[in-house]
Regions:
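A structural signal for short hydrophobic beta-strand segments in well-ordered beta-sheet cores
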Residues: 129-132
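FAD-binding glycine-rich core of flavoenzymes that anchor FAD
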Residues: 67-71, 86-117, 135-136
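Conserved protein kinase catalytic domain
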Residues: 61, 84-87, 101, 157
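Amphipathic, small/basic residue-rich leader segments at the start of a protein or domain
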Residues: 1-78, 94-99, 103
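Active-site-adjacent elements of ketosynthase-type condensing enzymes
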Residues: 119-127
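FAD-binding core of FAD-dependent oxidoreductases
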Residues: 70-85, 105-114, 144-156
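A short core secondary-structure module
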Residues: 141-175
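Short, solvent-exposed loop/turn elements at beta->coil junctions and helix N-caps
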Residues: 46, 116-120, 145-146
C-alpha cells in the first residue's frame, strides 16, 4: 500500500506542477487529474482511475486540494457521487464510459438526479413516473420536481417505475 500511496502522491504532485490549479481553468486542471487517474483512483485505468484502493483517493485529494485545486464533488455532486459509479458499472461499452466519464470529471457536463415528484416528494415508494418499453426505446411519462442543478445539467439520472405490478418498493429502474 505504501508503494501505491507514493505512486498516487507522485502523480498528484506532477499534476499540480504541470497544471497549477491557481492559474489554469478548472476544466483543464480536472482533465489533467482524470488523465493521470486521480479522479477516482479506484476506477480502472483509462476511466479516470488507477485500479487502486479507494482509500488512496485521500492521498490524491490532500495534495490536489492543498495546492488550491477544486473539490469536484462540490462542483458536480450527482456526477461524481452517483452517475460516475453507475456509468462505470453499467454503460454498454468502454467507448460510452469514456465519452461520459471524462466530461463528467472535468465538470464540462454536470449531472442531476430526477427522483422527486409532485405528490410524492422524495418518497421513492410513491414514485409515479413510468417507463414503458417501446421497441428498442423507453417511453417516459411523468414529472419531476426539486431537481438541484437541473439548470446547469446536461445529463440526469432518472428514476422511473418499470414494473407497475411490483410492490411499491420494487420495479424501479434508473435511466
Amino acid at each position: 500500500m505504501a508503494v501505491d500511496a507514493d505512486r498516487v502522491a507522485g502523480l498528484a504532485h506532477r499534476v499540480v506542477t504541470e497544471h497549477d490549479p491557481k492559474t489554469v481553468p478548472v476544466t483543464e486542471f480536472l482533465g489533467a487529474c482524470y488523465d493521470a487517474g486521480l479522479s477516482w483512483v479506484h476506477f480502472p485505468e483509462g476511466l479516470g482511475g488507477l485500479g487502486l484502493s479507494r482509500g488512496l483517493q485521500a492521498v490524491a485529494d490532500a495534495i490536489l486540494q492543498g495546492a488550491g485545486g477544486p473539490v469536484p464533488l462540490g462542483l458536480n455532486p450527482m456526477g461524481y457521487g452517483m452517475a460516475a459509479p453507475t456509468v462505470r458499472e453499467h454503460a454498454q461499452s468502454e467507448d460510452v464510459k469514456k465519452s461520459l466519464l471524462r466530461p463528467l470529471a472535468t465538470t464540462e457536463d454536470i449531472w442531476c438526479q430526477l427522483f422527486s415528484e409532485p405528490g410524492a416528494g422524495s418518497d421513492l415508494a410513491g414514485l409515479a413516473t413510468s417507463a414503458v418499453p417501446d421497441g428498442g426505446e423507453w417511453v417516459i411519462n411523468g414529472q419531476k420536481v426539486w431537481t438541484s442543478l437541473a439548470h446547469k445539467a446536461r445529463w440526469g439520472l432518472l428514476l422511473a417505475r418499470t414494473n407497475p405490478d411490483a410492490s411499491k418498493f420494487k420495479g424501479l429502474t434508473t435511466f
